[in-house]
């Protein structure tokens, strides 16, 4: 029972802080562009305004447009409940398995892309197709990096992998480092930041698959996207940067929560700086960049076999 409560608390905290971290990215962008920019809490205001506005949808749209925002939010909330964020143990282990997380993210991405294609908007349709292409290019690299780390740790459970890496009880540390590098790059691609912001390229597609959403649906979708970014970063930290998490509940869990928030703050600052230091990649060059990540993950497999 305590674990279920902890999982719910984790998900609620991530839901509460997700707009703050997305607002932090906007502030970093403004500062690097020598602009005043919005407040770091602007995303909270945007979500509140959208929730109060009426909703309008295309007459030609099917259930996919209506079901995507709550489904996207539910998947992000579920994953936040399962990851070992505040402690070393996963509150709900069935949600904290690497395979479960991959399939859950694929489900939300599929409906996110389907929402754009189904909306009868040309820009949203192109954005949805690009979102699916990004999925095809990113997921193999993610899977290979995860499986390389899972082979070394002997488990696909995120908590077990993090505990073994934190204790240094892995037989192939070089393989773990290479898998961590590949997974880190794949997670950055998953965040949809430059130079990999293809599905929502503002200059080209006008917010991509979200073009036909409005009102509460758009608010929920934007909140879910912010939550997903925090979940992806928490996923990476839980496996490859697991230090600082307590082993038990109680007061130590509060310290673990603070450590997690500090990790997220540092990661989002780094992501914001990188995103604003590069230009958007050409759509046709994405395959070459993602194959480099796959190559690093395959090299990690080689070191797993060698045992280095």
Predicted regions and their residues:
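Alpha-helical transmembrane segments
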Residues: 6-17, 93-106, 168-190, 253-256
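Membrane-interface amphipathic/juxtamembrane segments adjacent to transmembrane helices
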Residues: 25-54
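Cytosolic juxtamembrane amphipathic/interface segments immediately preceding
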Residues: 46-64, 122-126, 209, 213-217
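Transmembrane alpha-helix boundary signature
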Residues: 58, 77-92, 112-121, 155-156, ...
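Mid-bilayer segments of alpha-helical transmembrane spans in multi-pass integral membrane proteins
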Residues: 81, 100-115, 136-149, 153
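Juxtamembrane/interfacial segments at transmembrane-helix boundaries in multi-pass membrane proteins
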Residues: 91, 149-176
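Interfacial loop-to-transmembrane junctions
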Residues: 270-297
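Juxtamembrane boundary at the C-terminal end of a transmembrane helix
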Residues: 299-308
